[in-house]
Amino acid sequence: NIAAGTDEGYVVDPMCGTGGILIESALTGRATLGIDFDPVMVEGSQQNIDWAQVDAEVKRGDATRFELPKDVAAVVVDPPYGRNSPSDEKLIEDMLANIRSQNSECKLVVILPVEAGGDDLDEEITTDIELPGYEIKSAFGIPVHKSLGRVMIIAEASTQD
C-alpha cells in the first residue's frame, strides 16, 4: 500500500529472494512480479507463492538488466544483506539505473539494514543514503533487535536528471 497507493500497475521486486514482498503485494490484489538471480531463490519463492495461494509471477533474472513490465506502479526491494561491500552498493546503483532508464514515474521503496540505536534514525538515513536518480520522500526506522534495525525508504524519480 505504501508503494503503490492504487491497484493500477505492477509491483516489482527485482531481488525477490523468498518472495515475502511478492506475497504481501499479491494479497492486496496488485499485479506482482519478482525477479531473482539465484535459481534456488526463484524456486523457493514460487513454492511460497503457491503455499500462500496468491497470484504472482516470479522468474530468474538480473536486477541490473531485467525488463520492467510496461505498467509499473512501484518497485519494492529488500536487497540481501550481511555483506555491505562496495560491490553491493554498485549492485544497488546499477539496479536503480536500470529501473530509471525504463520508467521515470514509478515509486521506489527500498528496505535496508542499519545499525540500531538513536532516536533520529529516520533523519539520519535521509541525509546519509543516496539513491541515484531518485529523491527520498520519507524514511522510517524499523527496530529489529538490539544491534540491527532496518529502514524503509520511499522515493520518487528525481526531476533533476
Indicate where each model-derived feature is located.
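Class I S-adenosyl-L-methionine-dependent methyltransferase catalytic core
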Residues: 1-161
